[in-house]
Amino acid sequence: MSEKKYTFETEVDKLLHLVIHSLYSNREIFLRELVSNSSDAIEKLRYESISNAALNEDDTDYAIRIDFDKDAKTITVSDNGIGMTEEEVIENLGTIAKSGTKKFLESLTGDKSKDNELIGQFGVGFYSSFIVADKVTVRTRKAGQDKSQATKWVSDAQNGFTVETITKEKRGTEVILHIKKEHLDLLEYHVLKGLVNKYSDCINTPIQMKKVEYDKDGKQTVKDEYETVNNTKAIWLRSKDEVTDEEYQEFYKYISHDFADALMWIHNKVEGNLEYNSLLYIPQNKPFDFWNRDKDYGLSLYVRRVFIMENKELLPPYLRFVKGVIDSADLPLNVSREILQHNKVIDKIKKAITTKILSELKKLASKDKEKYQKFWDSFGQVLKEGVSDDYSNKEKIAGLLRFATTQSGDSKQTVSLADYISRMKEGQDTIYYITSDSYKAAANNPQLEAFKKKGIEVILMTDRIDEWMMSTLTEFDGKHMKSIIKGDIDLDKFETPENKEKFEKETKDFEKVLKEIKEVLKDKVEDVRLSKRLTDSPSCVVVNDYGMSLHMQKMMEEAGQGFMPGMGMKPILELNAEHNLVQKLKNEADTEIFADLSELLLLQAMFVEGAKIEDPMAFVKLVNKYIR
């Protein structure tokens, strides 16, 4: 059949350009990526053949072969895996079926070192072939398909690609790289074997190369007989003592396609009523599309060394950054995704590895604060989801949280709840915190004034998830957690008798004017009262203890979500009795000015709090009216 010509989709063209021009220094990854693809294809066939043995076509000696030809200047990576149909070839090699591709491409800066890191986080897979090859030919036949229905794909990365139907005796895929002249040094046995041992030594499938012999003069002879050049014993089944740090790191890069080393790993063998091996990794950096809700995540599930699937059920969502492998002997080989969702063995494994991960993170936080801080900076926000999602581990997760505070000096989140408790003032039995849009807004919030004056530390929470998290984290280590922007604040135990008496007197003096302000503001406020929070600012707004903070209200409105009745939507206006503006209001006889100043005190407090102001122009006009 004659060949058909196709053009790459726009994103592929751009990615190919990046691969060719930005990843020259990382050329070695091409072999890792191709071997990884071949391994995946074999694992898929291994799984599919459990229910359909005919797919094996009487060939169950699964292997990946690497051949090179110095005369033809080619490297060929072939496998006897599942193979592809013509439609799959066009879909897999002509498009990028990866969400967030456009956003990724837009995020590139032009700085090669930064872009290389981003490209590494994205993963380039098959397209890495074009780092070392100026033309790539793919020959493939799907397992079970007629020999005459195989497919050939050819591209030079410049002018799209061609596809034609060919005859291929054996199932599987072979990728033929026509090596660029500047990379001809790759056409050596010891070079290719070295790359296999460096990047793919621990994969489950034998990687084979033709034997090479040397005579006494060092002349090389390539034999027709193949030998296995990798250690085929799965790394997760080996003893920890047998595995080097380099092997752990290379296996991480193999399964994650990350350029950077893993931050840490957890290698575990469990025996007894429940038997499984696990090798889990925590990356250094979150991938560029980490917050994409449609992105797949999960651990690779094996049953007695047979790959089954990437499975979300093995991890709670708040640990979705963890990479790795679980190999269980307690599941059937023909297990389906639907069965896994309601499987007691999976539930037990999930519970056990969740406990193990949290335990290892706790150890890391204790033994290596700098390393833990790197973890927190990358994945702290997603770990916070666990406080609300995982009640049984809430206290453990809370112990891993880190925050900025009024005493930490900057926006870096370094303070644990245990740190906070260790330096609480004598007589303090409450952990105080404030939520806000940003560190500066939180650190300069007027409601901190009394706390700063009394030397009471306040946690500054500025992540979008914090308000939601704190709705379930009401105490830690026996200490009540209290938002300083909700309800009344009782700091009387830190007050002098003179100040207590003074506040009681001011409350009586302002009783009449507070009622008048409330009448002026009508349904805009729930109440008006004197503040124990303020020392310098004239006013602030709070909500009742069980109401939704103004910060949360704003976020929900921005997300297009409505409010349930009775959630305490109206703010409480608090006034500083000693402030000149409040004193002026108290003594103001002109009803128009009294009403304007009352409105102004409310609106400026709402503005400082980051709350939604219904009519910003009216606020500006009111301010301008009293600027002298």
Swiss-Prot record:
InterPro entries: HATPase_C_sf (IPR036890), Heat_shock_protein_90_CS (IPR019805), HSP90_C (IPR037196), Hsp90_fam (IPR001404), Hsp90_N (IPR020575), Ribosomal_Su5_D2-typ_SF (IPR020568)
GO molecular function, one term: unfolded protein binding
Spans annotated as C: 555-628
Gene3D superfamilies named in the record: 3.30.230.80, 3.40.50.11260, Heat shock protein 90, C-terminal domain, Histidine kinase-like ATPase, C-terminal domain
Residue span of region A: 1-337
Highest taxon of the lineage: Bacteria
PROSITE patterns membership: HSP90
Subcellular location: Cytoplasm
Keyword list, A-Z: ATP-binding, Chaperone, Cytoplasm, Nucleotide-binding, Stress response
Signal peptide: none
Main location: cytoplasm
Ranges annotated as spanning the membrane: none
Region of interest (B), ranges: 338-554
Cellular component, GO, one term: cytoplasm
Protein role: Molecular chaperone. Has ATPase activity.
Subunit record text: Homodimer.
PANTHER family recorded: HEAT SHOCK PROTEIN 90 FAMILY MEMBER
Entry similarity comment: Belongs to the heat shock protein 90 family.
Designated name of the protein: Chaperone protein HtpG
Species name: Francisella tularensis subsp. novicida (strain U112)
Lineage: Bacteria, Pseudomonadati, Pseudomonadota, Gammaproteobacteria, Thiotrichales
